[in-house]
A protein has these predicted regions:
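Alpha-helical substrate-binding/gating segment
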Residues: 173, 191-194, 199-221, 230-254
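Conserved C-terminal active-site "lid" loop/helix of NAD(P)H-dependent oxidoreductases
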Residues: 254-281
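Conserved glycine-rich Rossmann-like NAD(P)H-binding loop of the short-chain dehydrogenase/reductase
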Residues: 25-40
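Conserved beta-loop-beta element that borders a ligand/cofactor-binding pocket
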Residues: 159, 168-194
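Active-site YXXXK catalytic motif of short-chain dehydrogenase/reductase
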Residues: 95, 157, 161, 165
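Conserved Rossmann-fold NAD(P)-dependent oxidoreductase catalytic core, especially the SDR/UDP-sugar
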Residues: 101-158
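NAD(P)H-binding glycine-rich loop region in Rossmannoid oxidoreductase-like domains
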Residues: 49-97
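N-terminal Rossmann NAD(P)H-binding glycine-rich loop of SDR-like oxidoreductase domains
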Residues: 4-26
Length: 288
């Protein structure tokens, strides 16, 4: 039985995972961490096995973080200061510092698994050349931050957000070299709010983009890039369940980085490593 602390549960992905883990038999307790304002609507209040924990991780004391970590044996970390790729360098640096404090608190208190929600934006600059990438060639060893995407104010480049994800991946790998901690950093593709259907993916890669702007500013090439990184809801569930439960004994090292997308036909993303190392079994294809 596992006790799992999930951060960022006021957001899309963290909220999804709370509901998923609350239903699985192997999870004894879910500690749902979010900013205090996120619990104003009473979320998770009546869900069996879920313990809501209002905590602002960016300003919490070391003692408060330590007390939170002590409630679980596993951490799944989604929380960021700004969850969109338009994050400033200051916001990205604050997210990195928050994660480092949580990660090392977990290691110092003897937790066995830390799962970090990294992002496709770690290689976002490859969107501009993705048509040249062979299927399955985009491994999690590649780094190329700087997604170009359209906003209502024009084109922006997400250097800070993607760079912070890369640095945190490396920190997780380094932290796992001692004291029995194992880490899994997952470069999550695109898993939308709610039903998360393929036909609602847009070519701008930005949920704030208007329909008119999508039509006038986005290319078919951009649409293929974003659709090929789709992660369905049930594949998301399987991916994170396996990231928590997989035995690290046969990994090449105790800290690993993997891609997290569905089995989308013809995509550049490589997911064989995720299948082999954690037993990921995707069932969906954006093109089917």
């Amino acid at each position: 039985m596992r006790k799992v602390l999930i951060t960022g549960t006021g957001g899309n992905l963290g909220g999804k995972l709370v509901h998923t883990f609350a239903k699985v038999p192997w999870c004894e307790k879910v500690v749902a961490v979010a900013r205090p304002s996120s619990f104003a609507d009473g979320r998770f209040a009546n869900i069996e096995k879920v313990e809501p924990l209002p905590l602002e991780l960016t300003s919490a004391s070391d003692g408060e973080i330590g007390e939170a970590v002590a409630l679980a044996d596993t951490i799944v970390h989604f929380a960021v200061v700004n969850a969109l790729p338009d994050a400033t360098w200051e916001e990205a640096a604050s997210s990195f510092m928050m994660t480092s404090r949580l990660l090392f608190a977990a290691r110092d208190r003897g937790l066995k698994r830390f799962v970090f929600a990294s992002s496709n934006h770690a290689v976002g600059a490859l969107k501009e050349v993705h048509e040249t990438l062979a299927p399955g060639s985009l491994t999690a060893e590649r780094v190329a931050p700087g997604t170009h995407w359209e906003t209502l104010d024009g084109c922006m480049i997400g250097y800070g957000y993607g760079s912070a994800k890369i640095f945190t991946e490396r920190m997780c790998v380094a932290a796992a070299q001692r004291d029995g901690l194992s880490t899994v950093s997952i470069r999550i593709g695109w898993c939308q709010v709610g039903e998360n259907l393929p036909h609602t993916l847009n070519a701008g890669g930005n949920p704030k983009l208007s329909a008119d702007k999508q039509e006038s500013k986005s290319s078919n090439s951009d649409l293929r890039w974003f659709r090929n990184m789709w992660l369905s809801n049930r594949d998301f569930d399987n991916l994170f369940e396996r990231a928590v439960l997989a035995d690290a004994a046969n990994w090449p090292q105790p800290g690993i980085v993997i891609n997290g997308v569905s089995a989308n036909s013809g995509m550049a993303w490589e997911i064989e490593t995720a299948k082999q190392l954690i037993g990921y079994r995707p069932q969906d294809d954006v093109w089917s």
